[in-house]
Amino acid sequence: MQFEEIVPQCEEPKFGGMDRRTFLKTIAAAGIAASGIGAAFMLPGTNLMVMPNSKGYLVVDMGKCMGCDTCMMTCSLVHHGEASLSLSRIQIQQDAFQSWPNDIHMAVCHQCEDAPCVKACPVEADHVDIVHGNVRTIDPDKCIGCTQCIDACPWLPKRLQWNPETKKVQKCDLCANTPYLRDKGGPGGTQSCVKVCPVGAIAYIDKIPDQNDPTAYNVNLRDKAWKSLGMTDIDIKREG
């Protein structure tokens, strides 16, 4: 009996109208061509955008956060030189009508694998920065304030913020462009929110969280001190 008789031959999947072999050749060639400029790029002859994964991510423990807003103040300080909640790129929301562990929501940029905000930007201000570990960031000199990137963000609250002072959009860059941070930021460097959190409710990781799990960025960072309170093993599965 022939192999073909045992295993039915399936139609080869198509990628933007190309067969698999052509797709792989095209993406390889396009990757080489784009490696010099380091931006997300469109596959020739398709409407598919390809971008390298970020080399760093922030994860949080909403059950550990105490809502002090230190991370928000520090974020605005290292980016803008002033402590302002409205200029922070990380957002902490508190609900007085809820009790622990549902009283605080921490919202951080996911540095999405297939970033909708990057795709939506009409002027390439929102881009993949290979100089700083492929972090998804916004070039304020290119941003025209159209807010299409904010609209494209699939998360609530939106992980991109409108800057009321510059009339442009900003987002977390893992502290890659922080003129007021003494340390080197960006993937592999210092993230100010992680460094200053008094309870360790924010962590930096280099492995991409599961992009199909909306709760993957909300992890358990509680330690032995929490065990005595009986709170160590309580997983808080909410969208991070």
Describe every region a protein language model picked out.
Residues 97-114, 147-157, 175-191, 196-199, ...:
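Short Fe-S-cluster ligation motifs
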Residues 46-57, 100-104, 131-134, 153-156:
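Short Cys/His-rich Zn2+-coordinating modules
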Residues 1-18:
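N-terminal secretory signal peptides
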Residues 27-32:
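Sec-dependent signal peptide hydrophobic core
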Residues 57-76:
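Mature N-terminal segment immediately following signal peptide/propeptide cleavage
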